[in-house]
Structure formats: structure tokens, C-alpha cells
């Protein structure tokens, strides 16, 4: 459902477990497509949705719950609509602490922490 939300219903992901191998199918408007056929923006949405989907599966299967998600530079490959939809999805998730690492992305509903490095010392500053 994550990819359907990120792509306004155009794409969906299917996870198939064969033995110990997890196969991921990308469906574009009802037809299976290869990942190489995707644009960089579509590829970014597929990657992000796959990460969120696997995290959810692991939470269902695991006895201990993962409540931490770090997304490093995922916003750079998403268009403005994709960024907004991802923030909406993340804000709806329950019991998760999400950190989005980005050099360019800002959102009014997200708290911002600036990290600067001077003389080998990193400083954190919350806004």
C-alpha cells in the first residue's frame, strides 16, 4: 500500500517469498515492469516504499518491535508531490521515530536538527 499511496495508485509492490529468497514485483497500472524501466523519481518511490514495506513485515514477524526509521537522502529523488505524500505516510505511522537526513528538504510539520562540523567537532542545534 505504501507505493500505491506514493504513486497515487499507479504502482504497487508484490512481495513473494520463495524458499529463503524474497522476490519483489513492481506493478505499473496492472503490468509487471522491470526496475530498470523506471525513471529516477519512480525508482525513488519504489525504493522508499520497499523499505517501509519490509520494515512493516519485520515488525509483524519479529518479537521485538522496530520503532526507529532513518531515511538518508530519500527526499532528493522524490518530486514535491512524492515528498508531501511520504511525510503524510510517516506522520500516520504509529510507534515510530523517524529521522529524515536531507540537505535540502524542510517541512512545517517536521522538527529540524542542524548538524554542523567545525575543527573536527560536530554540533547539534534543534530548531
Residue ranges and their predicted role:
Residues 1-127:
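Terminal ABC-like ATPase head and other globular end-domains that cap long coiled-coil arms
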Amino acid at each position: 500500500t505504501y507505493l500505491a499511496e506514493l504513486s497515487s495508485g499507479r504502482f504497487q509492490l508484490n512481495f513473494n517469498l520463495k524458499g529463503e529468497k524474497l522476490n519483489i514485483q513492481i506493478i505499473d497500472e496492472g503490468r509487471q515492469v522491470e526496475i530498470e524501466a523506471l525513471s529516477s523519481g519512480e525508482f525513488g518511490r519504489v525504493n522508499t516504499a520497499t523499505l517501509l514495506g519490509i520494515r512493516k513485515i519485520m515488525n509483524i514477524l519479529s518479537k521485538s518491535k522496530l520503532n526507529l526509521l532513518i531515511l538518508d537522502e530519500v527526499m532528493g529523488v522524490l518530486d514535491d508531490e512524492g515528498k508531501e505524500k511520504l511525510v503524510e505516510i510517516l506522520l500516520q505511522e504509529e510507534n515510530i521515530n523517524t529521522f529524515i537526513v536531507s540537505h535540502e528538504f524542510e517541512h512545517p510539520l517536521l522538527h529540524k536538527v542542524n548538524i554542523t562540523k567545525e575543527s573536527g567537532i560536530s554540533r547539534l542545534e534543534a530548531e
